[in-house]
Amino acid sequence: MGGQKTHFGFSTVNEDEKAGKVAEVFHSVAKNYDIMNDVMSAGLHRVWKHFTIHTAHLKKGDKVLDIAGGTGDLSRGWAKRVGKEGEVWLTDINSSMLTVGRDRLLNEGMILPVSLADAEKLPFPDNYFNLVSVAFGLRNMTYKDAALKEMYRVLKPGGTLLVLEFSKIYKPLEGAYDFYSFKLLPVMGRLIAKDADSYQYLAESIRMHPDQETLKQMMLDAGFDSVDYHNMSAGIVALHKGVKF
């Protein structure tokens, strides 16, 4: 790892440079991340996350790992599902995002363990969690295969991985979606977050992310069984689910 080339949006960079460049993006957008999510998706990200939470079928006392948990939307939902006897870890590789998420949850009276963690080298034991989730984070990881194998490792047998991520939209809508992503989104980033470049990268990173079938195969290759996905909003996002047997 490290000597090869990879993509950073539409640009090509050394593999060992990508993580630092992605970190710069999320340090920049952290404070405005929630409001930009609402503006960018017209609030739909809340619906997508709500669906994800209801898909999990958690029970009281379960253990959950929220990878790239950012500002804590999923962690909040998981904590309500598993109760005080459960365990939910909010993790992110970016300290700015993790701080915003931790503080936001504290302001709501919710105390959860947090960890500044790299998904490709998770600091958790084997066979520990009932559920691992990653929402809008996998596409930013340099070594996605390694991250998926780590998620598999920390899951208990019978545990579930949920990957909520931007995906490939239905073909008839591609033109309109491209116009929105590459013309309007950077303008909104400049006006609201004073940062057009970061939102240009986010739009480009979506286009470079594996499509639904490719990600399904990647999860199978990482060891998961019963892998399937559910498209939402005409394929703008997809929720992939895999089980460790």
UniProtKB/Swiss-Prot annotation:
It comes from the Bacteria. Gene3D superfamilies: Vaccinia Virus protein VP39. Disulfide bonds: none annotated. It is an enzyme of class 2 (transferase). Pathway: Quinol/quinone metabolism; menaquinone biosynthesis; menaquinol from 1,4-dihydroxy-2-naphthoate: step 2/2; Cofactor biosynthesis; ubiquinone biosynthesis. CDD domains: AdoMet_MTases (cd02440). S-adenosyl-L-methionine binds at residues 71, 92, 118-119. Coiled coil: none annotated. Keywords: Menaquinone biosynthesis, Methyltransferase, S-adenosyl-L-methionine, Transferase, Ubiquinone biosynthesis. Its EC number is 2.1.1.163, 2.1.1.201. The keyword Cytoplasm does not apply. It catalyses: a 2-demethylmenaquinol + S-adenosyl-L-methionine = a menaquinol + S-adenosyl-L-homocysteine + H(+); a 2-methoxy-6-(all-trans-polyprenyl)benzene-1,4-diol + S-adenosyl-L-methionine = a 5-methoxy-2-methyl-3-(all-trans-polyprenyl)benzene-1,4-diol + S-adenosyl-L-homocysteine + H(+). Signal peptide: none annotated. GO terms for molecular function: 2-methoxy-6-polyprenyl-1,4-benzoquinol methyltransferase activity; demethylmenaquinone methyltransferase activity. Pfam families: Ubie_methyltran. SUPFAM superfamilies: S-adenosyl-L-methionine-dependent methyltransferases. GO terms for biological process: aerobic respiration; menaquinone biosynthetic process; methylation. Methyltransferase required for the conversion of demethylmenaquinol (DMKH2) to menaquinol (MKH2) and the conversion of 2-polyprenyl-6-methoxy-1,4-benzoquinol (DDMQH2) to 2-polyprenyl-3-methyl-6-methoxy-1,4-benzoquinol (DMQH2). PANTHER family: 2-METHOXY-6-POLYPRENYL-1,4-BENZOQUINOL METHYLASE, MITOCHONDRIAL (PTHR43591:SF24), METHYLTRANSFERASE (PTHR43591). Belongs to the class I-like SAM-binding methyltransferase superfamily. MenG/UbiE family. This is Ubiquinone/menaquinone biosynthesis C-methyltransferase UbiE. It comes from Neisseria gonorrhoeae (strain ATCC 700825 / FA 1090). The gene is ubiE.
